[in-house]
Amino acid sequence: MSDKVIVTCALTGAQQGKEANPNLPEQPREIIEQALDAARAGAAIVHIHARDSRGKATADVAVFREIAEGIRAKSDVILNLSTGGAVAGLPLEERLRVLPELKPEIASFSIGSGSLLGRYDAAGRKWLRDQYVPLVPSYAEMETAARIFRDNGVRPELEIYGTSFLNNVWHLREAGVLEEPLLINLVMNIPGECIPWSPKNVLFFVESLPPNNRWVVTAIGGKVHFLSVALSVAMGGHVRVGMEDNVYIERGVLARSNAQIVEKAVGILHAVGREIASPAEARQILGLRARV
């Protein structure tokens, strides 16, 4: 267990938008501003998706570049860029273009197949069950992607949505294409082919991971979001919060910003006697190269 806890803030995601919470950032200027505020509130890492001018998910490197450069100019917070983005049908090489083009320290890497339900209808309080986000990497694609990460000096954050993904972590590790310590994100509570959040499920997944790892839980939804903070830190993990995963600060009350959510998470950590890691300390914990 690390002495200090890394807080990741997932700023915007690729699914719900301002229809779910008008304070959710969509455009580059909004994302940059909220990233900087989240870093000041205690986030050592910001996880970033890009949106086009209509608020739809995009893998456009130019949009990612605008966001990344705007943050890097004012903060040493660690950037974790999405390579998924819910851009259906986009070829692997297009999704991975941010790696050689922008050289983020971390980027997300989905290592399994399945379908996740799409946008949330806030007015109707229901998920639109006819919209799917397919995750269909083959073993060959996963190994190719892992090598692209490695060759560009980008640490993959391995996204685990279900039990079959665990086998893929072990496979890629044994294939020698992953750098350690492994960065693991246990994604829970997304409707579709995704594991529900519960203490028992978190325990099972954590105990099933290869050794020498650093893990967080993505706990979707206001009912479990902050419970997950307390559970994860008690089990030796790190913490992920933010408006990608939860748009509420408390039951029925929309969050004003990502920074407000980070502040609440930091308060939980301090209440149980844990300190938060700075970006520099997070780099040491994760085995990342120092930023120059």
What is each stretch, according to the model?
Residues 106-243:
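Catalytic alpha/beta core domains of metabolic enzymes, predominantly
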Residues 31, 38, 49, 107, ...:
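Conserved, mostly hydrophobic/aromatic
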Residues 11-33, 83-91, 131-136, 157, ...:
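Active-site mouth loops of central-metabolism enzymes
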Residues 58-136:
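Active-site beta->alpha loop and helix N-cap motifs at the rims of alpha/beta catalytic domains
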Residues 1-23, 115-125:
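N-terminal small/glycine-rich loop or linker at the start of catalytic domains
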Residues 9, 56-83, 145-149, 204-212, ...:
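Alpha-helix-loop-beta-strand connector modules within alpha/beta enzyme cores
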Residues 117, 121-128, 250-274:
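C-terminal helical cap(s) of enzyme catalytic domains, especially alpha/beta-barrels
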Residues 19, 44-66, 187-190, 247-251:
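Glycine-rich, proline-tolerant flexible connector loops at the mouths of alpha/beta enzymes
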